[in-house]
Amino acid sequence: MDAILSGKSGKMMTQAVEKKGVKIIGWTENGFRELTTSKGPITKPEDLRGLKIRVVGSPIFIETFRALGANPVNMNWSEATTGFQQGVVDGQENPTNGINIPLKIWDYHKFHCDWHYIIDPLMLGVNPRVWKSFSPEDQKLLLECAAETEKYGKALSRLGMDDGSALAYLKSIGKLPETTDCYAVMEANGMTVSRLSNEQIAALAKATEGVRKDWTAKIGADLVKAGE
């Protein structure tokens, strides 16, 4: 993710958004969107067949789960927990540290799958006219704050999943959250955690290859190639 945002593709995305009238002053992230279910562990495409999965209403999410044989359900997040309780849906996908841990997803689902199928980048944007109204000194201060926000947001989303850098950084600024090991917390609350191998992830990617091709054409092959 860092390589993409600091490289050619990140610059291309920033330019594309700024052409639409938004000044980008930074990037952070909400983490990989992982899968939780009530029906059983997910380790291969076949495990998703027939499952009703609550997804964001974006077409790329819906098409991805359909390609895997699941039944994606576009449901507002405000209705999701009720849907879990009533069995309207069998699972959902969301960032672990940002959503699943605070929600205590183990109250609804007992199976977690780390498959890294998509990551949530977050743009820090401002109205260009408002930005130009600030003094150079204030702009500099805001850019410094944005840079700190980038580091803080990334550390929160990666905590317990990286090489320990996130933990060290959050300790250094005195901002450690209550949960520092998401996997241990999920397992302690009765969840089965499946951390997929590269081979297992490749099988899921192969099953959604058609979706990738379609969206490469829509997004732009040059941008996708730059990101690769």
Where are the language model's segments positioned?
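Core domains of carbohydrate- and sulfate-ester-processing enzymes
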Residues: 5-9
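N-terminal secretory/targeting leader peptides
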Residues: 1, 11-228
